UniProtKB/Swiss-Prot annotation:
This is Major sperm protein 2. Keywords: Acetylation, Cell projection, Cytoplasm, Cytoskeleton. One of its GO terms (cellular component) is cytoplasm. It comes from Globodera rostochiensis. It is found in: Cell projection, Pseudopodium; Cytoplasm, Cytoskeleton. Disulfide bonds: none annotated. Transmembrane segments: none annotated. Sperm. PANTHER family: MAJOR SPERM PROTEIN, MSP DOMAIN-CONTAINING PROTEIN-RELATED. It comes from the Eukaryota. The modification N-acetylalanine is found at A2. The keyword Metal-binding does not apply. Residues 8-125 form the MSP domain.
Amino acid sequence: MAQLPPGDIATMPNQKVVFNAPFDNKATYYVRVINPGTNRIGFAFKTTKPKRINMNPPNGVLGPKESVNVAISCDAFDPSSEDTKGDRVTVEWCNTPDPAAAAFKLEWFQGDGMVRRKNLPIEYNV
């Protein structure tokens, strides 16, 4: 039996993550991840700047029609001395092999199963 591809997810906001100056304190931006589909999914966040950008929770499981708010935090930094071009967070998701899975498992993303990605560029308003 062929594996079903993961359905779409929705994020709010849909296009990008925005952090506003000043950048001398930690700032947090919330992204809602929504599973509008009919299958349980596992999701995981990644970033191009793991020393500056953190996500909480960084991964999880969403049942059909469920959602979660993910806190994306940016540690204090000096934008004049650091390259911010290309900064982004990426959410990856896949169908869970077990429709009743309640806990995230990294192995879902390490096999040959289908994984989808959505990139959210980070914009820094100086």
